[in-house]
């Protein structure tokens, strides 16, 4: 039975109560204080102090200061009046019990409201952070699009200027071609109109219509305006170099590696963007790779809930990409959703088949994350199995080796305790 304390001192003003309670040599760390509107309790074993207040107080503003083997309470009254006494007179056991229960229920409700308010504030902060990040990305995308548009306009204007120069040059060439035949014809006419001498019989002159000048002038124009004949058709043979994996020939897994490449190609084609629920999304938001990169950025900023949302949407668009499940498992580990982390790691391992060198790192991470989730659930044997599977993939990984050794020590220590 605790020893009830009745030694204390108090003073009051119309708005405040000042209460001093000695701790009687008890360590300050062992003192437990509970304060409600009508009830005050201090438990400092083996002593117990209870006070059923005369009138309600504002327990949210009231304060307690512990020091020098004394607790100093500053209690703020709800109504600024002087009290006749500090505690309610004539309180029986039933009334005390009712006041205790009522105070405890009020404290629980306030704690619940505070927790809910904190959760709402946290969600609002996360939503605000996600909105700000999306706004920044939208501004960057718009800036890039503006740069592209400016470059396109610049290239278009340069092309138009070049076309205009070409038109002017072609016009000048056509004018020069027209002037050359006229000059030749004028020269022939001038020669034909020269005066002839009387004593000498002039030879008969020929008209320049079908003479040598005809053959010299118009064939040049025809040669210049002649269009070359079209080229003969042909065919070009194209062959692609085969993809070669960096694997020794004695350890080669050509069939498995080809199967893995085939599965990767099928996974890239397995898109579900034609569903009605995705019509409102932007073009980049329908791209699983873009969503995966966005989830990675959110994970790096420790916004794990938003990262899970990004991976969820990417998986709904394409459920055949193993890295989406692997990254979402890492988020669930951070959020302590251990069973979901195990499910996502198992799904990633299911998609990372057949086992080849190209997916070895991803398989190792999947085993480690599933083993970590098992260990946090205190299923150390299952966790050790996953860590050993990871070591088979990457035997030189010292971090995984150290973690596996710690798990073995835990299992051996548990076995020794059970024997004792």
From Swiss-Prot:
Involved in neuronal migration during development of the cerebral neocortex. May regulate the stability and proteasomal degradation of the estrogen receptors that play an important role in neuronal differentiation, survival and plasticity. Axonemal dynein assembly factor required for ciliary motility. GO terms for molecular function: nuclear estrogen receptor binding. Residues 3-87 form the CS domain. One of its GO terms (cellular component) is plasma membrane. It is found in: Nucleus; Cytoplasm; Dynein axonemal particle; Cell projection, Neuron projection. Residues 164-192 have a biased composition (Basic and acidic residues). This is Dynein axonemal assembly factor 4. Interacts with ZMYND10. Interacts with ESR1 and ESR2. Interacts with STUB1. Interacts with DNAAF2. Interacts with CCT3, CCT4, CCT5 and CCT8. Interacts with DNAAF6/PIH1D3. It holds the Pfam family CS. It comes from the Eukaryota. Residues 164-212 are annotated as: Disordered. TPR repeats lie at residues 288-321, 322-355, 364-397. The lineage of its organism: Eukaryota, Metazoa, Chordata, Craniata, Vertebrata. Keywords: Cell projection, Cytoplasm, Neurogenesis, Nucleus, Repeat, TPR repeat. It comes from Mus musculus. GO terms for biological process: cilium movement; determination of left/right symmetry; epithelial cilium movement involved in extracellular fluid movement; establishment of localization in cell; heart development; inner dynein arm assembly; learning or memory; neuron migration.
């Amino acid at each position: 039975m605790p020893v009830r304390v009745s030694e204390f001192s108090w003073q009051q003003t119309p708005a405040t109560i000042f209460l001093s309670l000695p701790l009687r040599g008890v360590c300050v760390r062992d003192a437990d204080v509970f304060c409600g509107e009508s009830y005050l309790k201090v438990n400092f074993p083996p002593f117990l102090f209870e006070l059923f207040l005369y009138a309600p107080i504002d327990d949210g503003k009231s304060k307690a200061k512990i020091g020098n083997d004394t607790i100093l309470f500053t209690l703020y009254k709800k109504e600024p009046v002087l009290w006749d006494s500090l505690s309610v007179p004539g309180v029986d056991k039933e009334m005390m019990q009712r006041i205790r229960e009522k105070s405890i229920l009020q404290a629980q409700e306030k704690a619940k409201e505070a927790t809910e308010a904190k959760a709402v504030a946290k969600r609002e902060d996360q939503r605000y952070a996600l909105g700000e990040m999306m706004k920044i990305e939208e501004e960057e995308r718009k800036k890039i699009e503006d740069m592209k548009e400016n470059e396109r306009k610049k290239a278009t204007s340069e092309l138009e200027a070049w076309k205009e120069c070409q038109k002017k040059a072609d016009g000048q060439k056509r004018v020069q071609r027209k002037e050359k035949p006229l000059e030749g014809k004028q020269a022939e006419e001038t020669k034909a109109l020269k005066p002839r001498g009387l004593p000498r019989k002039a030879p008969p002159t020929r008209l320049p219509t079908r003479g040598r000048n005809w053959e010299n002038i118009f064939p040049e124009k025809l040669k210049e305006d002649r269009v070359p004949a079209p080229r003969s058709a042909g065919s070009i043979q194209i062959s692609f170099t085969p993809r070669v994996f960096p694997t020794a020939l004695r350890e080669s897994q050509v069939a498995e590696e080809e199967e893995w490449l085939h599965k990767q190609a099928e996974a890239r084609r397995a898109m579900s963007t034609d569903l009605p629920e995705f019509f409102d999304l932007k073009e980049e938001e329908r791209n699983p790779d873009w969503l995966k990169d966005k989830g990675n950025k959110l994970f790096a900023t420790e916004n794990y809930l938003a990262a899970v949302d990004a991976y969820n949407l990417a998986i709904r668009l394409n459920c055949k990409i193993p890295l989406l499940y692997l990254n979402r498992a890492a988020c669930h580990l951070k959020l302590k959703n251990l069973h979901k982390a195990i499910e996502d790691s198992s799904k990633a391992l299911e998609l990372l088949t057949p086992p080849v060198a190209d997916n070895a790192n991803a398989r190792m991470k999947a085993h480690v994350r599933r083993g970590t989730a098992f260990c946090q659930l205190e299923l150390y044997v299952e966790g050790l199995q996953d860590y050993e599977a990871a070591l088979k993939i990457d035997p030189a990984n010292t971090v995984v080796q150290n973690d596996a050794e710690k798990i073995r020590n835990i299992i051996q220590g548990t076995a020794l305790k059970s024997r004792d």
